[in-house]
Amino acid sequence: MSLQISILTPERPFWNGQADEIILPTETGEMGVLKNHAPIITGLNVGAMLIRGGQASGSKDEWNSYAIMGGFALVKQNQVTILANEAVSAENINPEEAKDAFETAKANLEKAEGVKEKVEANFAYKRAKARYQVVKVLKKI
């Protein structure tokens, strides 16, 4: 295995193990991390995080998906430490509920008026979209 990955949330350590690759939803777009990646600290956006191989899955080529609700990532010496506001595995998300929540959040965003309502609707939309994306990766819906 190439990377030691630790994902921590305020409630508990979420996941700790080895993997071959991780794709993070950073503030500037998706960032892939492989063995011997340059050291970096980056902000994480609300979005889908993917982990390939190792203890994350039964197969070297299998991807596992997680919804991350923002945070930070530190990459250094083949260790990836993620401090996330919240994290949830695709396996723990109901696909139908995720789809319904996404469609509702999208509709609410489109009809939002006023700055506060738009900001709240945008965050709810990003959150619902992340959950729906990771379920689609896992369930292929």
Swiss-Prot record:
One of its GO terms (molecular function) is ATP binding. GO terms for cellular component: chloroplast thylakoid membrane; proton-transporting ATP synthase complex. Keywords: ATP synthesis, CF(1), Chloroplast, Hydrogen ion transport, Ion transport, Membrane, Plastid, Thylakoid, Transport. The keyword Nucleotide-binding does not apply. Signal peptide: none annotated. It comes from the Eukaryota. GO terms for biological process: proton motive force-driven ATP synthesis. Disulfide bonds: none annotated. It is a peripheral membrane protein. It is found in: Plastid, Chloroplast thylakoid membrane. Changing residue 45 to D: In strain: CC-2290 / S1 D2 and CC-503. Coiled coil: none annotated. F-type ATPases have 2 components, F(1) - the catalytic core - and F(0) - the membrane proton channel. F(1) has five subunits: alpha(3), beta(3), gamma(1), delta(1), epsilon(1). F(0) has four main subunits: a(1), b(1), b'(1) and c(10-14). The alpha and beta chains form an alternating ring which encloses part of the gamma chain. F(1) is attached to F(0) by a central stalk formed by the gamma and epsilon chains, while a peripheral stalk is formed by the delta, b and b' chains. In plastids the F-type ATPase is also known as CF(1)CF(0). Belongs to the ATPase epsilon chain family. F(1)F(0) ATP synthase produces ATP from ADP in the presence of a proton or sodium gradient. F-type ATPases consist of two structural domains, F(1) containing the extramembraneous catalytic core and F(0) containing the membrane proton channel, linked together by a central stalk and a peripheral stalk. During catalysis, ATP synthesis in the catalytic domain of F(1) is coupled via a rotary mechanism of the central stalk subunits to proton translocation. This is ATP synthase epsilon chain, chloroplastic. It comes from Chlamydomonas reinhardtii.
